[in-house]
Amino acid sequence: MKLLIFAILIALSSSVPQLSEKAEEAVDLAYQEKNNLFDLGSVAGDILSRSGCHVSFGCHKGYCWAGCGDPTNPWSWGENWCYTTKSYSQSYSYVQCTQDSECDGCWKCGGPCSA
């Protein structure tokens, strides 16, 4: 019986989404589930960290993206996102990628925020 309970606890703990290092530093962040970076409709939040960088970001269809909702308005979290750029905002010079680790939540929006 104890072994069964132990196995259930292990299974449950391994299925709980893990916080990223940047998410742990986010302002007033109580919980952030791991983003499904290939389905932008399921982004959990786009809260800014203390450094001004977005917590939600990744690689989608070959380009880096980041959440761009209003961090002071919880209703906007997860609704808006943009493809990012390493240069100035709205440059339309998007950063190409093949995996999430190539992207950075501190990059600016290369184009408009969209839902």
UniProtKB/Swiss-Prot annotation:
Keyword set, alphabetical order: Allergen, Signal
Signal peptide boundaries: 1-15
Signal among keywords: yes
Entry superkingdom: Eukaryota
Protein name per Swiss-Prot or TrEMBL: Allergen Tha p 2
Taxonomic placement: Eukaryota, Metazoa, Ecdysozoa, Arthropoda, Hexapoda
